[in-house]
């Protein structure tokens, strides 16, 4: 598996309006998916079989009642095992240089690759619980997120049908939001 990440422009999270962050996040997600597909084509031209993994939607599994989505594989965990970062209490992957402001992508390949070392830095201070304590929905519990509670506030659909990312406090309040 090849796992990679792109940085999300951090200025977008500090805008008073949620549209800049939603826009930046959507464009970066499309860019990550596009990069994955381009890499697949390059590798296939070299005779290597590939499978692109979507960096967001569509979900492999969706529970309507719990508002719980799961992808084909956990890109956060893939990023951790690829050495791209460590998992924070906010459940996001925290990269040493870019913090949690990254979008992760991956492709599966049918060749043996050399492993990168797993990151061994501290992503969250032991006593820090800013993200957990500040979550207006109380959706975080240090190891997972209650997606239903989170989605009730974070995903907002406008009258015109646009999906806006209204809450990202767990990302922005993190002292390591922009790097360690």
Task: For every predicted segment, state its role.
Residues 1-30:
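Non-catalytic, usually N-terminal nucleic-acid engagement modules in DNA/RNA processing proteins
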């Amino acid at each position: 598996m090849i796992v990679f990440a792109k940085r999300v422009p951090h200025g977008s999270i500090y805008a008073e309006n949620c549209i800049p962050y939603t826009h930046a996040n959507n464009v970066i997600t499309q860019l990550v998916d596009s990069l994955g597909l381009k890499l697949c084509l390059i590798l296939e031209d070299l005779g290597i079989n590939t499978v692109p993994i979507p960096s967001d939607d569509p979900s492999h599994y969706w529970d309507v009642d719990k508002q719980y989505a799961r992808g084909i594989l956990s890109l956060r965990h893939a990023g951790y095992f690829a050495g791209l970062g460590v998992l924070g209490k906010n459940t996001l992957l925290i990269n040493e240089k870019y913090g949690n402001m990254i979008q992760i992508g991956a492709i599966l390949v049918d060749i043996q690759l050399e492993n990168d070392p797993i990151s061994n830095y501290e992503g969250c201070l032991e006593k820090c619980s800013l993200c957990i304590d500040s979550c207006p929905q109380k959706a975080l519990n240090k190891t997972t997120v209650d997606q239903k509670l989170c989605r009730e506030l974070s995903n907002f659909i406008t009258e015109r049908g646009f999906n806006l990312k209204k809450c990202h406090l767990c990302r922005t309040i993190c002292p390591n939001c922009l790097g360690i």
